[in-house]
Amino acid sequence: MSFCSFFGGEIFQNHFEPGIYVCAKCGYELFSSRSKYAHSSPWPAFTETIHADSVAKRPEHNRPGAIKVSCGRCGNGLGHEFLNDGPKRGQSRFUIFSSSLKFIPKAEETSASQGQ
C-alpha cells in the first residue's frame, strides 16, 4: 500500500463475481476473476494476467520489488506488480486501480466469445 496513492473509489476491491477484467480504455483482456484474491490493500489484487502480453512492465527505480504496469495494447496506466508478494510463495501481486478496469461478467464473456 505504501507504493500507491489512495484516492478511494476502488469499486473492484471486494468484487468477486466470475468474469474478466479488461482495460477501461481499449477493452484488452487483462485479468481473470480466477486470479483475483482478497488483500489488505484498498486496490483489487490479482496473481497473474490473462495473456503474456496483457500488461507492459516498467521498473520503479526508486522502489525495489515494484514494477509499474500498463495495458499491453494501449499503454493505459494500470498500477503496479509487486514481486513475490502474492498469496503463495513466488507469486506476484498485481495492485490495480479500479478506474483502469472494466468488468465483463462470465455470461457476457461467453456470449461475446460465441459471436453473439
Curated annotation (Swiss-Prot):
**Could you tell me what the cofactor note in this record states?**
Binds 1 zinc ion per subunit.
- What positions does the entry give for Zn(2+) binding? 23, 26, 71, 74
Q: Where in the cell is it found?
A: Cytoplasm; Nucleus; Cytoplasm, Cytoskeleton
**Cofactors required:** Zn(2+)
Write out the GO biological process terms.
actin filament polymerization; innate immune response; protein repair
Residues forming the catalytic site: 95
Substrates-to-products reaction catalysed: L-methionyl-[protein] + [thioredoxin]-disulfide + H2O = L-methionyl-(R)-S-oxide-[protein] + [thioredoxin]-dithiol; [thioredoxin]-disulfide + L-methionine + H2O = L-methionine (R)-S-oxide + [thioredoxin]-dithiol
Check the UniProt entry and state the signal peptide residues, or none: none
Where does the MsrB domain start and stop, copy by copy?
Answer: 1-106
Q: What is its main location?
A: cytoplasm
Known InterPro entries for this protein?
Met_Sox_Rdtase_MsrB_dom, MsrB_Met_sulfoxide_reductase, Mss4-like_sf
Q: Can you summarize the PTM annotation of this record?
A: Truncated MSRB1/SEPX1 proteins produced by failed UGA/Sec decoding are ubiquitinated by the CRL2(FEM1C) E3 ubiquitin-protein ligase complex.
Q: Which Gene3D superfamilies match?
A: Peptide methionine sulfoxide reductase
Assigned keywords, A-Z: Cytoplasm, Cytoskeleton, Immunity, Innate immunity, Metal-binding, Nucleus, Oxidoreductase, Selenocysteine, Ubl conjugation, Zinc
Identify its protein family: Belongs to the MsrB Met sulfoxide reductase family.
Protein name, per record: Methionine-R-sulfoxide reductase B1
Species source reads: Bos taurus (Bovine)
Gene that produces this protein:
MSRB1
